[in-house]
From Swiss-Prot:
Transmembrane segments: none annotated. GO terms for cellular component: cytosol. CDD domains: CMP-KDO-Synthetase. This is 3-deoxy-manno-octulosonate cytidylyltransferase. Belongs to the KdsB family. It comes from Shigella flexneri. The keyword Disulfide bond does not apply.
Length: 248
């Protein structure tokens, strides 16, 4: 099954300026992400960036670059520009791999592409089980609840589902059915074209989660449990030091 990986790599970052180019053990972070994507067996890998320095680093590593506008409000909007510039057919399977995930396992890149290809749905993603209450109550850990067929009912920074009896006892662990969403998505190109023509939804603005736009407009998102748990992503200088140590 063929699929394309697009890696959005925005240069500007409030907490970590020039994030795609930060050095991790002798290589820019974006090159580590590119290498993980290559291991997935993708037919084509494109780094979508708004900065010449990022483009040069990717091209020096033998990667393909698509220059995009700097004013996109989300990674999906950046993907949409690439979809149009590359004239992908509507049924092309595209996996969005975040440019700040240098430890993402290649197996889950392939997994999300396979899951999408096996279903008549526009979008697929992954999640991992939550086992401790600290993560369940952390607003930076996005939670997702599913229906019986594995489709998302809702994504939230809040603690969902609310385990009334267990939480009343102040337990440190959580029961079953708690899932943390992973920021990796598979789409068909035609779905991306439709998505960017929808107005942002009120829930999306409240939670600051762009995937809620999909549910708002009545579309489905399939969610599978990831075959591997990805390593730390890089959002802050502290994350960067942790990743450097783990990848040493």
């Amino acid at each position: 099954m063929s699929f394309v990986v697009i890696i959005p790599a925005r240069y500007a970052s409030t907490r970590l300026p020039g994030k795609p180019l930060v050095d991790i053990n002798g290589k820019p972070m974006i090159v580590h992400v590119l290498e993980r994507a290559r291991e997935s067996g993708a037919e084509r890998i494109i780094v979508a960036t708004d900065h010449d320095d990022v483009a040069r680093a990717v091209e020096a590593a033998g990667g393909e670059v698509c220059m995009t506008r700097a004013d996109h409000q989300s990674g999906t909007e950046r993907l949409a520009e690439v979809v149009e510039k590359c004239a992908f057919s509507d049924d092309t399977v595209i996996v969005n791999v975040q440019g700040d995930e240098p430890m993402i396992p290649a197996t889950i890149i392939r997994q999300v592409a396979d899951n999408l290809a096996q279903r008549q749905v526009g979008m697929a993603t992954l999640a991992v089980p939550i086992h401790n209450a600290e993560e369940a109550f952390n607003p930076n850990a996005v939670k997702v609840v599913l229906d019986a067929e594995g489709y998302a009912l809702y994504f939230s920074r809040a603690t969902i589902p609310w385990d009334r009896d267990r939480f009343a006892e102040g337990l440190e662990t959580v029961g079953d059915n708690f899932l943390r969403h992973l920021g990796i998505y598979g789409y068909r190109a035609g779905f991306i074209r439709r998505y960017v023509n929808w107005q942002a939804s009120p829930l999306e603005h409240i939670e600051m989660l762009e995937q809620l736009r999909v549910l708002w407009y009545g579309e489905k998102i399939h969610v599978a449990v990831a075959q591997e748990v990805p390593g730390t992503g890089v959002d802050t200088p502290e994350d960067l030091e942790r990743v450097r140590a783990e990848m040493r």
